[in-house]
Amino acid sequence: MCKIYKGFLLSFQTQKEKGRGTDREGYIMKDYIITTDNNADLPEEYYTQHGVGCVYLSYTMDGKHYSHENFMPVEEFYAKMRAGSLPTTAQVNPSDARALFEPYLKEGKDILHIAFSSGLSGTYNSCRIAAQELAEDYPERSIIVVDSLAASLGQGLLVHLAQKMKEEGADMEETARWTEEHKKNIVHLFTVDDLNHLYRGGRVSRTTAVLGGMLNIKPVLHVDDEGKLIPI
C-alpha cells in the first residue's frame, strides 16, 4: 500500500520481519539506508564511511558527455567554464533512481531518499516515480522520498543530520518526519562571479543576469521556500 504524506512517498510495510533490531516496547526496527544525489556536494568518502547511497547527475560540456565514471577534475571543469564553456546537466531519470534503490530493496532494506530541490530539477520527481514503481515490485519494503527544497551543502546538511539520527537509533519514519519538518530551516546565502552561467542554466532570470553584469553587481542569492534560486 502506498500513501503520499507531506510531500513524500511512503510505502508501508505489510508484515513484520524477524531478525531486525528491537526498539522500545518490543517495536521491531526495520533496517533502512539513507540515499541522496551528488547535488548534496558531500565528499565521496562520506558516502563510503557512513553507508549513504548516492545517485549521480551527469553533464555535457563541449559536446562530450560526463557521468560519474568519467567526471573531469574540478580544476579542469572550472577552467573550461572561465574560458566560456557551458555545462548542461541532465536530471536523474527514473531508471537511474531505480538502479540505486533496487539493490538495497533486494537486501531487505527500506530506503529514505533525500532529493535535490524540485524547484531546481526534475530529479525529485524521477525518484518519486521510481519509488512508486518499486513499491509494486517490493510491497513488503518501504521507500520514502523527501523533496529537500535545498541544494549543495544545504541538501548535504539535511543528509548528514538525517544520517546522524539514524546512527543514534531513530527509525526511518521518525527520521523522515524530522527532515520534512525542518528542511525549511536551511538557509542558503551565496554569490557568484558570473551570473550568465546561472542564466544560461535556467537558474536566474535574464533581467537579473543583465543588470548584474551591466552594473557589476553580484547579488546575494538564496533558495526560497519553494526550493527556487532567487536574488535577495
Residue ranges and their predicted role:
Residues 80, 108-113, 136-146:
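Glycine/charged-rich beta-loop-alpha catalytic/anionic-binding loops adjacent to active sites
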Residues 96-127:
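N-terminal glycine-rich phosphate/adenylate-binding segment common to multiple enzyme folds
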Residues 33-96:
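N-terminal glycine-rich anion-binding loop in soluble enzyme alpha/beta folds
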Residues 8-28:
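Short, Lys/Arg-enriched N-terminal segments with co-localized hydrophobic residues
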Residues 31, 39-47, 52-53, 58, ...:
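Mixed-charge interfacial surface used for oligomerization/domain docking
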